């Protein structure tokens, strides 16, 4: 009956593929309109600012509508944002979109940098921005922290920033406790 109705109304050439939520007791006519207008179910995934690549993979792995396995990508290679995802889309495809968004945005921001910048590459800028972001949870403090770190780097000093120690210990996952004295002495890469 559905095929006949779609064919008779000419909607067979206008149907749009996708995932739909059809209300219970929907009429045949309203279902056809839904499919022709393409009012598909939309799913979103948010990668918050400041989250590590390992945490991003955790988010992707919790999304049951996605398929496939992914390795944890390089730190700083994913752009934090809200992404629209589709049922049966691969996790690798979502990671690739996050990486393309990072490349586009980093290129745009790199072009706007100060000529006096202490960082010499977009990758260094991303690393420094990540450290600044982890050093303070307050956006209003970030310019001061960034200036202090830039001055230290300009003078050849160490950053001596807790987030660099935590990252060396956890590889991007939360530490969940204070830093131990022994960890302050240990070399981390």
For every predicted segment, state its role:
Residues 168-189:
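C-terminal soluble interaction/assembly domains
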């Amino acid at each position: 009956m559905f095929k006949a109705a779609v064919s008779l109304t000419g909607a067979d050439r206008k149907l749009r593929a996708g995932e739909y939520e059809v209300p219970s007791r929907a009429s045949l006519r309203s279902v056809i309109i839904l499919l022709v207008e393409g009012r598909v179910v939309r799913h979103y995934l948010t990668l918050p600012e400041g989250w590590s690549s390992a945490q991003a993979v955790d988010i992707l792995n919790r999304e049951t509508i996605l398929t496939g396995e992914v390795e944890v990508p390089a730190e700083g290679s994913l752009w934090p944002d809200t992404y629209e995802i589709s049922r049966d889309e691969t996790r690798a495809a979502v990671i690739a979109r996050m990486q393309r968004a990072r490349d586009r945005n980093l290129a745009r921001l790199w072009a706007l940098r100060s000529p006096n910048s202490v960082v010499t590459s977009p990758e260094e800028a991303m690393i420094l921005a990540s450290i600044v972001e982890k050093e303070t949870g307050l956006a209003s403090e970030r310019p001061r922290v960034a200036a202090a770190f830039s001055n230290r780097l300009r003078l050849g000093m160490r950053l001596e920033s807790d987030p660099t120690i935590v990252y060396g210990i956890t590889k991007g996952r939360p530490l969940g406790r204070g830093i131990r004295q022994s960890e302050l002495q240990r070399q981390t890469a």
